């Protein structure tokens, strides 16, 4: 079973957490090219295309200017991302075996690096899939990655039991030939809902927390049977058979 996760917007370039030796991203050449073209954008343009405050745009500008600097060391992706999902994966207590298990059973979808493994070494960046870089063609980053990474994802899922645990947000799907992925492997998509105002609602922050916690649960317990995921509970969230349909599994907090 392979976990698919969205990247985080917040990142760091340093960590005190000890992890196994990093690996080279499989689309490193593409990432280098993207980052090189991003250096041409001034701060105000980065603010516009990435929808950033002036302060964050300035930070983004510095990061792209430093992207190819040899004195700026990359960091394993699972440590570099610091958003809500990754805080809840909480790799600070991972053993070497946990990291290695995650390397085989987890993938992140990056607008700059493409499909990433947890130990792939990356540098901080900021990217949105709707960004257009003229030198890379007429389309945006969705178009850039769609054909490049689809077969890589399918191959990675088929290396195991042909089951993809889709814990990514909907907005990453257009970066793949998603219909082809659906035809090629089984996709299980958990949904995390809260009972509010007489109905089940998705609250984004809680959904992100649960995605991270479920990923951690799978890694720490070495889960390979998807049925075992139905035993996942966290902060009152639990699997609801009556609300689930097919491979769309609902976990409800009542």
Swiss-Prot record:
GO terms for biological process: response to hydroperoxide. Signal peptide: none annotated. It comes from the Bacteria. GO terms for cellular component: cytosol. Disulfide bonds: none annotated. Belongs to the UPF0246 family. NCBIfam families: PRK02101.2-5 (NF002547). This is UPF0246 protein BDI_1226. The lineage of its organism: Bacteria, Pseudomonadati, Bacteroidota, Bacteroidia, Bacteroidales.
